[in-house]
């Protein structure tokens, strides 16, 4: 009986050590490890408006945001700001680092491509993720890259991409909302130390504890290399906001990230916010 208990204990210890090792390997060390781009897109898909989207990504039970960029021991509140031009929207996700500094986390880029078609991607900011990380909706039921097989279904349409079917997001409630004639571009009213009454910051989790909580968001979103929403990106670029504080705090992590990226064969990204081809992340 004692031998059996020892054996079981050894197995448990081995599995725990293996899981810890894998978590360490998957972490990039960049702040972006603590924000789920896939989770943000899922919240955007669920939200009926940009205002509701802002509330969802800042809700503790959604497990999308685990960022503490200024190191004060509390989760950062993420503002949403819509930069728009004609049928193009760039929803900027931004954190107030201090009274005088802000930092962009990511931007959701949306373009209307027809009367009832639209394409969307979220792009993680280079200062937060180490490089631009692009994620889009996928009908494939698994995270994939541009070389994977194409999906199918009523919400998909071709974008002249030989290997992928790009999801039509026009019928997402929030997308329909922003294309209404009476829509006024959403600009979050909140700022440093002035936040909505329903929101209370919480202490950030360690990466190995946070990652399993947002793991399920990866299933219906693809990490891709192709930047499809080019007009929206041009609209956003002049408004990009960077924080000196964030760049200073992440200088070492950014250097390590670049070394790891340079060593990777074929230019594959480090895997903190997504996996390679054929693997769920």
Question: At which residue positions do the language-model features occur?
Answer:
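Bacterial N-terminal signal peptides that target proteins for export
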Residues: 1-8
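Bacterial N-terminal signal peptides
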Residues: 9-18
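Boundary at the C-terminal end of the N-terminal hydrophobic targeting segment
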Residues: 19-23
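Short N-terminal segments immediately surrounding and downstream of signal-peptide cleavage
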Residues: 24-43
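Extracellular/luminal recognition modules and glycoprotein regions
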Residues: 39-59
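Acidic, glycine-anchored loop motifs typical of Ca2+
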Residues: 65-77, 99
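Soluble periplasmic/extracytoplasmic beta-strand elements of cell-envelope proteins
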Residues: 76-81, 90-94, 107-109, 119-123
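Low-complexity segments
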Residues: 98-107, 112-272, 276
């Amino acid at each position: 009986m004692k031998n059996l208990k020892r054996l079981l204990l050894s197995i448990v210890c081995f599995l725990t050590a293996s899981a810890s090792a894998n978590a360490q390997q998957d972490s990039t060390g960049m702040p972006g490890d603590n924000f789920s781009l896939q989770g943000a897109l899922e919240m955007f898909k669920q939200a009926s408006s940009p205002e509701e989207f802002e509330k969802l990504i800042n809700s503790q039970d959604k497990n999308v945001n685990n960022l503490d960029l200024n190191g004060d021991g509390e989760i950062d509140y993420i503002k949403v700001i819509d930069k728009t031009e004609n049928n193009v929207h760039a929803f900027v996700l931004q954190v107030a680092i201090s009274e005088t500094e802000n930092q962009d986390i990511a931007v959701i880029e949306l373009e209307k491509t027809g009367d009832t078609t639209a394409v969307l991607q979220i792009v993680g900011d280079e200062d937060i993720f180490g490089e631009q990380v692009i994620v889009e909706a996928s009908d494939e039921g698994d995270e994939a890259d541009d070389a994977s097989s194409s999906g199918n279904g009523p919400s998909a349409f071709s974008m002249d991409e030989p290997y992928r079917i790009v999801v039509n997001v026009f019928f997402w409630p929030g997308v329909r909302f922003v294309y209404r004639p009476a829509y006024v571009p959403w600009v979050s009213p909140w700022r440093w130390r002035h936040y909505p009454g329903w929101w209370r910051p919480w202490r950030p989790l360690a990466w190995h504890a946070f990652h399993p909580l947002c793991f399920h968001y990866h299933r219906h979103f693809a990490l891709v290399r192709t930047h499809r929403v080019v007009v929206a990106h041009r609209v956003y670029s002049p408004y990009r906001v960077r924080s000196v504080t964030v760049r200073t705090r992440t200088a070492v992590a950014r250097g390590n990230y670049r070394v790891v990226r340079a060593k990777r064969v074929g230019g594959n990204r480090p895997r903190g916010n997504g996996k390679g081809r054929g693997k769920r992340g």
